[in-house]
Amino acid sequence: MSKARVIILLALASLLALPMGIATANHFEGTAAISDDKAASDSITFSLKGVHAPSAGTQLVGWLISDDDATKLSTGAMTVASGDTVSHTFGSSSTGYTGANLIQNFSSLVITEEPSGAVPAAPSGATVYHYDIPTAAIAQIRAVASAGGTGSAQDLKTQLAAAKSELTLARATTTLDIVRTHTHKAINIIEGPTGSNYNATHGVVEGIGVLGHAQAAIDAAALVGAASADAKAAADLVQITAKNAKTFAELARDRSVSLVLTETNLAQLDIHLANVIGVVENAISGLDANADGSIGAVDGEGAANLVYTNAQAMGTYKLKAGAPPPFIVPTAVPTATAVPTATPAPTPVVVPTATPAPPVVGASSVPLMAHMALLAALALLIGGGVVLLSERRRTQG
């Protein structure tokens, strides 16, 4: 092969390799998922890749931010491992841990570059990654995962456990009237006060019952899916598993009414109660319907336990490079006055500030290297052309 052809091939190879190198250097993906450690939703785990190394003398620090931007909780300094990855967990052993419910108390997350050493009390450096859970989504996520300290997902599990306890007491007795009393209590817990089989003489139940909590989770998750594309997959799983829990609970209720309350033979009652207790356990833990060795978030399998974990997943932060838009304090709506001559004060206009530029992801020398590679490739192409032309003239001469 002639020298000219070799030079031209090298130039083409340089041009083809250049875009791949740039794309690799700029790729970033990151999530921060909330889970239980010592308390409900008190821990968050970061999984990041394609992370740019912090500037000399600085470190990356995570911050959870409240809805009103007033409270900022440091999740600690992060170490960028080889391969530009970060794996970091904030939990009960971390500095600054209080056991607070992170879903209930926060809705935004930023990662900033801070001076190396002690983590400051509040973020002061440049924001390099961020995510804000949409306002319309966070309220419904909390309704399922954390409202009132528990949310409908935990309330569902609590009520199912109470129903199982009553049925277990019914099975433990040999007195027919006591069996029926405990069974009625279980039915009341499942149906709630508005149920067609509810009987207050056997025990008043506060709240909305198992079926009510399951439906509340279904309804809230549907609104989450409509409000946030990032949370839709988890919201769909909440709906599937809550529907499964509701179906199992309804079956337990129906069998309690049709089998337990109508039976007078104690031996047969024991069989029926064992069956109903098993169905309630399905409503809690789910059922391996296809016998594949696992209980998944699919129709007929996963139930209340998976409602809760998928509710937490709806609150996962899917980080983006750069800083978020500046926080704007909501303007209060003026209250109408009965005095006709009163002139409402004009609402102050918030002047938007420029959004900070996103961080440089990858090595800072990438743009310079790209220009140098382009110049080298052009030089090789021109040089190869000159050599090729010279060889042809020499051959023709």
Language model features with spans:
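C-terminal membrane-anchoring or membrane-association module
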Residues: 376-397
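Bacterial N-terminal signal peptides
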Residues: 9-19
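Short, surface-exposed binding/anchoring microloops in extracellular/periplasmic proteins
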Residues: 26-60, 64, 174
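Exposed aromatic-hydrophobic patches
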Residues: 46-49, 82-100
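Mature extracytoplasmic or organellar-lumen-exposed domains after removal of signal/transit peptides
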Residues: 98, 111, 129-333
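Solvent-exposed serine/threonine-rich low-complexity stretches and specific carbohydrate-binding patches
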Residues: 73-83
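Short acidic/polar inter-strand loop motif in beta-rich domains
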Residues: 108, 113-124
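Ser/Thr-rich, Proline-interspersed low-complexity disordered segments
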Residues: 20-25, 329-370
